[in-house]
Amino acid sequence: MDKVCAVFGGSRGIGKAVAQLMAQKGYRLAIVARNLEVAKATASELGGIHLAFRCNIAKEGDVHSTFEEMEKHLGPVNFLVNAAGINRDSLLVRTKTEDMLSQLHTNLLGTMLTCRAAMRTMIQQGGSIVNVGSIIGLKGNVGQAAYSATKGGLIGFSRSLAKEVARKKIRVNVVAPGFIHTDMTKHLKEEHFKKNIPLGRFGEALEVAHAVVFLLESPYITGHVLIVDGGLQLTA
């Protein structure tokens, strides 16, 4: 299979799990991360036909050059997954402006930039994009006002883009995870939080990855937000 899947934030967590599933299906992977060595290690684990790239998605020049390099070495990108993200938990009155901006730039602007860069070739050939959001973007949460704004904005952006490019055979969807075992949640006390989750546990990155791959490959779904949270939204 010659189709190419670019996974931004593909060196760890949900992004890495998506890359593993897509590699198993025979797609060629571009593993993109800020840390090139970690990205290379992930690409190496997947096998010889996959490549690693360094990119700071908050920088327009980085995104543009990364897409040029991916297309040069792998070919046009057919699937795009935006799984890169950061969080700076803090009550708004205590949140530094630079922390607000870093979350906005990575979680929202970065995804806008990668999606726009992908359009250059996808408009000619079609494609599928999945942006990894968060249940917090739908529910909100104390101490995560800035983070929630970025993830809520991601949903509005993705739905709008889905409308813009549907006639070009480009689909855009969102996966909104709840509490998932990743680096972002490892500091949380699971026993305290899981009592509010109907399924009684945190999810695994691979479980979210299956949802991402489902949306990537589903030809008649676009503009959808798929919640993967063990039923957490039912308790709101």
From Swiss-Prot:
Protein localization? Mitochondrion matrix
Q: Which reaction does it catalyse?
A: a (3R)-hydroxyacyl-[ACP] + NADP(+) = a 3-oxoacyl-[ACP] + NADPH + H(+); a quinone + NADPH + H(+) = a quinol + NADP(+)
Query: N6-acetyllysine modification sites?
Result: K40, K96, K194
Where is NADP(+) bound in this sequence? Answer: S11, R12, G13, I14, R34, N35, A83, A84, G85, Y147, K151, I180, H181, T182
Q: SMART domains, per this entry?
A: PKS_KR
Enzyme Commission number, as recorded: 1.1.1.100, 1.6.5.10
Residue positions of the PTM N-acetylmethionine? M1
Intrachain disulfide bonds: none
Sites marked Important for interaction with acyl carrier protein (ACP): K168
Q: Does the keyword NAD apply?
A: yes
One protein family per Pfam: adh_short_C2
| Enzyme kind, highest EC tier | oxidoreductase
| GO terms of biological process kind | daunorubicin metabolic process; doxorubicin metabolic process; fatty acid biosynthetic process; protein heterotetramerization; protein homotetramerization
> According to its UniProt record, in which pathway does this protein act?
Lipid metabolism; fatty acid biosynthesis
Q: Which Gene Ontology molecular function entries are recorded, alphabetically? A: 3-oxoacyl-[acyl-carrier-protein] reductase (NADPH) activity; NAD(P)H dehydrogenase (quinone) activity; NADPH binding; NADPH dehydrogenase (quinone) activity; oxidoreductase activity, acting on the CH-OH group of donors, NAD or NADP as acceptor; quinone binding
Family annotation (SUPFAM superfamilies): NAD(P)-binding Rossmann-fold domains
Q: Name one GO cellular component term.
A: mitochondrial matrix
Name the protein family. Belongs to the short-chain dehydrogenases/reductases (SDR) family.
What this protein is reported to do is described as: Component of the heterotetramer complex KAR (3-ketoacyl-[acyl carrier protein] reductase or 3-ketoacyl-[ACP] reductase) that forms part of the mitochondrial fatty acid synthase (mtFAS). Beta-subunit of the KAR heterotetramer complex, responsible for the 3-ketoacyl-ACP reductase activity of the mtFAS, reduces 3-oxoacyl-[ACP] to (3R)-hydroxyacyl-[ACP] in a NADPH-dependent manner with no chain length preference, thereby participating in mitochondrial fatty acid biosynthesis.
Protein name, as recorded:
3-oxoacyl-[acyl-carrier-protein] reductase
The record lists the organism as Rattus norvegicus
